UniProtKB/Swiss-Prot annotation:
Gene3D superfamilies: Globins (1.10.490.10). PANTHER family: BLR2807 PROTEIN, NEUROGLOBIN. Heme b binds at H64, H96. It comes from Rattus norvegicus. Its EC number is 1.7.-.-. GO terms for molecular function: GDP-dissociation inhibitor activity; heme binding; metal ion binding; nitrite reductase activity; oxygen binding; oxygen carrier activity. This is Neuroglobin. GO terms for biological process: cellular response to hydrogen peroxide; cellular response to hypoxia; negative regulation of apoptotic process; neuron projection development; oxygen transport; response to hypoxia; response to iron ion. Its main location: cytoplasm.
Length: 151
């Protein structure tokens, strides 16, 4: 990724990373609104959540949100050399495949990520920032998809 795009990503992430749980909850609220069929994939100790709200208030799911935000943070930190995260992201892809996540669902996750960024950043979420984040997310999903492909 080119330096101007990397800077847009880092600058915008600074605002988000001040409240990762709050913004991660926005991301997953949007995800469940767009693709409710994902909710049953989140089960902890055999517990099936009855609603997105039930899931989003669960301590176990809040821990999942924290982990997702840490993965995004790692991608932002390594935005100019994502190859250093390739094996980790492929392993993450395998783990998601193992619990029943469809690769196609990651496009909805991407939409939810952009939604969260827009809500957090307001007018600072410019078209250039949107494009930069779309490129970063696309690279992350490409690396994770190797976990589906078994590469």
């Amino acid at each position: 990724m080119e330096r101007p795009e990397s800077e847009l990503i880092r600058q915008s992430w600074r605002a988000v990373s001040r409240s990762p749980l709050e913004h991660g909850t926005v991301l997953f609220s949007r995800l469940f609104a767009l693709e409710p069929s994902l909710l049953p994939l989140f089960q902890y100790n055999g517990r099936q959540f009855s609603s997105p709200e039930d899931c989003l208030s669960s301590p176990e799911f809040l821990d999942h949100i924290r982990k997702v935000m840490l993965v995004i943070d790692a991608a932002v930190t390594n935005v100019e050399d994502l190859s250093s995260l390739e094996e980790y992201l492929a392993t993450l892809g395998r783990k998601h495949r193992a619990v029943g996540v469809r690769l196609s669902s990651f496009s909805t996750v991407g939409e939810s990520l952009l939604y969260m960024l827009e809500k957090c950043l307001g007018p600072d979420f410019t078209p250039a920032t949107r494009t930069a984040w779309s490129q970063l997310y696309g690279a992350v999903v490409q690396a994770m998809s190797r976990g589906w492909d078994g590469e």
